[in-house]
Amino acid sequence: MYRVIDLHCDTIPNMYSDFREGKEASLLSNSGRIDLNRMREGGYICQCFSLFTHLGALKKRGESPFTHVLGLVDFWKTQIAEYPDIIGQVTTAESMEENARMGKLSAMMTVEEGGVYEGKLENLYALYDKGVRMSTLTWNFANELGYPNPAIAPGSPRIPDMVNGLTDTGKSFVEEMERIGILIDVSHLNDAGIRDIFELTHGPVIASHSNARTLCSHLRNLSDNNIRMIGERGGVIGINYFVGFLEDGGKIGRIEKMVEHMQYIKNLAGIDAIALGSDFDGFGELCELSGAEKMQQLAAEMERQSFSSAEIDKVFSLNALRVFQSVLS
């Protein structure tokens, strides 16, 4: 069985929403696509759990993004602490490997929506101290740091935003994230912002849950140039299982298409640039990989499409582990 590191899921925000509504919310077993039982069945060693925050919804409620994300952090930590023999929080590759040796799963805390920092570096430091080790700059809203590549309707022209780059505050955040050891995640960020990140930084940059724009025209996917740049920097791209990022006009997230994106990225940037970023529990559409327990089916399709066992090991865990070792000291 191939070991799995998944760079992105939205399980915790969904559970937190249920919790706040008085519903049952358990990381051990739930109605989503990721829980501890399924992770063990699927061969996982680490799941990166995003603290996804919807700025639009918070604005309507009059709720502070930073206050909201602190609530998510507390809920996340409570869930992890409830099952100490099964899973443990990690902030380094070494602690992840130690958990694996003890037969435990690992959980890494990540941020999806740089607006939670409210433009204040002290909030970045506070979340770092709580264990955040990966962060996007945006989700689907402009914020104090930068601008997203917006969703587009089918048939709309592909016009990436090459004008509105990172704000001055965003540039300061990127430099500080690299300095203190938070993985810079360019998923959701517009092309101009990604360009700025490559100009400002020196080490690995990742896209935790993005695919190739040439194969699927959604602007959330990466241009060929950005795929190459991530590879040249020693970063990784987590393949996203959502059908809307896999193929134009698709009805179900097909495993075959996931591997086609891998093949394309391999040809542009090399096998070392590919990882997994399921986006599980961040979409409701049909997916052949219906949950974490199905992950070895992806390995079987990779074998069918002529990936070697060594290459599958890299994509499933070793490439992400290499980046963690490089950045998360």
Tell what function each PLM region has:
Residues N240-Y241, L268-A292:
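Short acidic/histidine-rich active-site segments
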Residues S290-S329:
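Mid-to-C-terminal alpha-helical segments outside catalytic/metal-binding sites
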Residues Y2-D6, C46, S106-T110, R133-M134, ...:
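Structural preference for beta-strand elements that scaffold enzyme active sites
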Residues M15-R20, A57, G146-N149, D196-T201, ...:
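Histidine/acidic-residue-rich catalytic or RNA/ligand-binding cores of hydrolases
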Residues S31-R33, R38-E122, N140-R179, A192-R195:
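A metal-dependent hydrolase metal-coordination microenvironment
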Residues G119-D129, A153-I206, L219-R233, E256-D272:
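Histidine/acidic residue-rich metal-binding segments in metalloenzymes
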Residues H8, M39, T92, G131, ...:
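Conserved, mostly hydrophobic/aromatic
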Residues F19-E41, Q297-A299:
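Short catalytic helix/loop segments, enriched in acidic residues and glycine
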